[in-house]
Amino acid sequence: MATIRKGNQDDCAAMAEIFNHYILNSNVIFSNRVRSAEDMRQLVEPVVDRFPFYVAESSGKVIGYCFAHKWMPDPVYGRTLEITIYLSHEATGQHIGSQLLERVIDDCHHLGTHRLISFITEGNEPCERLHAAHGFRLMGVLPEVGYKFGRYLNDAIYLKDLC
C-alpha cells in the first residue's frame, strides 16, 4: 500500500532514479541525458514551497511523484500550470498515479489555477488513459518533435479546465 505525502528536496535522488529509468529504457521522456539528484533539486526548488508537489512512498521508498509547475515564465500564463508525473516502473497499474494526480489537481484548484496542461509522448497509453480519466482532453499533437531510439516521436497536448 502506498502512502501519499508532500514532496521535498530529500526525495530528489529517488526521483532521479525513477526519471532515469524512463530516459534509458523508453521514449516517454524526450531526453537522452541522465539526471542527478542535484539536477532534480534544481528542477523542484522553485516548486517545493509554491506549487503542489506529492510523492508516493511504499516501505520507505519513493515510488512515484507528481507536481505542478509554471508552464511558461511570463506572468500572463500564471494561471496555467503544467503537470509532471512519473511512477517507478514497478509501481504502475496500482492506481498510484491516480492518487498522486488527484491530490495535485485538488491543490491546483484551491490555488485558483485556471488550466492544467500536460505533454505526453503519443502512444504512452497508460499516461494518456490516466489523464483522460481525470478530465484532461486531447487538444492536439505536435508531430515528430522528438527523436529517440532511431525514430521520430509525437508529443500530445492534454488540457484540463479547473474554473
Each predicted region: which residue ranges?
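Conserved acetyl-CoA-binding loop-helix of GNAT-fold acetyltransferases
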Residues: 93-106, 129-133
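Acetyl-CoA-dependent GNAT
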Residues: 33-90, 101-102, 161-162
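Conserved catalytic-core motifs of GNAT/GCN5-like acyltransferases
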Residues: 70, 117-120, 132, 137-154
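Glycine-rich phosphate/pyrophosphate-binding loop shared by adenosine-nucleotide-utilizing enzymes
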Residues: 2, 61-65, 153
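A short beta-loop-alpha structural element at the N-terminal edge
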Residues: 3-15
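Active-site acidic-Proline motif in GNAT/NAT acetyltransferases
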Residues: 85-90, 94, 106, 122-123
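Conserved GNAT acetyl-CoA-binding A-motif
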Residues: 108-120
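Conserved GNAT-fold acetyl-CoA-binding loop/helix
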Residues: 16-43
